[in-house]
Amino acid sequence: MSMQEKIMRELHVKPSIDPKQEIEDRVNFLKQYVKKTGAKGFVLGISGGQDSTLAGRLAQLAVESIREEGGDAQFIAVRLPHGTQQDEDDAQLALKFIKPDKSWKFDIKSTVSAFSDQYQQETGDQLTDFNKGNVKARTRMIAQYAIGGQEGLLVLGTDHAAEAVTGFFTKYGDGGADLLPLTGLTKRQGRTLLKELGAPERLYLKEPTADLLDEKPQQSDETELGISYDEIDDYLEGKEVSAKVSEALEKRYSMTEHKRQVPASMFDDWWK
């Protein structure tokens, strides 16, 4: 088995998908999981990007189906901007498409600034822009878990195969969640699900960005990764890619294994 085949298997990627079936399966997964846990629904941060838009709409479909069957569940979509978000219009368009039961907003800027200032006061050192970006992501995780704990909701994550293979998420930030409805999907497969769901093109054709850096606002994921999502998706779907792309992805996959595992102990061997 090649490394490419191994990664495809470990990340549960299918070379091709039936969008309607994927939507049904993922909505059913959400329904079954929330019923099993006894939770009252889901909470998810909505950025206006493809991934949170898709996960949010799947969550809303799941809770509506539960209610139609006589159950009780809700979905809270939460906006978590750091000050003024440049693509706020996209976030509002995403909310209009998702149609969540509730939509709340918490601006994380004051929290992040307070910690950054205290860090500098205590250490004499200023947080790097990259490290501060991770603080933003982890602050958003704290907010979602606060809502989840208060309302009895499960926190959804938006990680998918193209992020998982590159480790392109913040550990205990956007990587902190109770369940992941997009697992196994490549970026382009996620787009096909949004098309099937009737999402506005603007939400899945826009350039993906984590938008965590103050010094490089709206920097694209592909610029930061140095690889295009088409190349990542081709690799994950079992297609032939250049040796350079294969080597880069396999190196990233190995280096970021710790992000896909629970914290290591002396009884684990995945890190050896």
From Swiss-Prot:
Residues given in the record as deamido-NAD(+) binding sites: 33, 138, 171, 178, 224, 258-259
Catalytic activity: deamido-NAD(+) + NH4(+) + ATP = AMP + diphosphate + NAD(+) + H(+)
Name of the gene this protein is made from: nadE
SS bond partners: none
Induction, per UniProt: By heat shock, salt stress, oxidative stress, glucose limitation and oxygen limitation.
SUPFAM superfamilies recorded: Adenine nucleotide alpha hydrolases-like
GO biological process, one term: NAD biosynthetic process
EC number of the protein: 6.3.1.5
This protein's pathway: Cofactor biosynthesis; NAD(+) biosynthesis; NAD(+) from deamido-NAD(+) (ammonia route): step 1/1
Matching Gene3D superfamilies: HUPs (3.40.50.620)
Cellular component per GO, a single term: cytoplasm
Binding site for Mg(2+): 51, 163
Function (record text): Catalyzes the ATP-dependent amidation of deamido-NAD to form NAD. Uses ammonia as a nitrogen source.
PTM statement from Swiss-Prot or TrEMBL: Phosphorylated during sporulation.
Binding site for ATP: 45-52, 79, 85, 158, 187, 209
Pfam families to which the protein is assigned, alphabetical: NAD_synthase
Thermal effects: Optimum temperature is 40-45 degrees Celsius.
Keywords carried by this UniProt record: ATP-binding, Ligase, Magnesium, Metal-binding, NAD, Nucleotide-binding, Phosphoprotein, Sporulation, Stress response
Source organism of this protein record: Bacillus subtilis (strain 168)
Family: Belongs to the NAD synthetase family.
Annotated protein name in UniProt: NH(3)-dependent NAD(+) synthetase
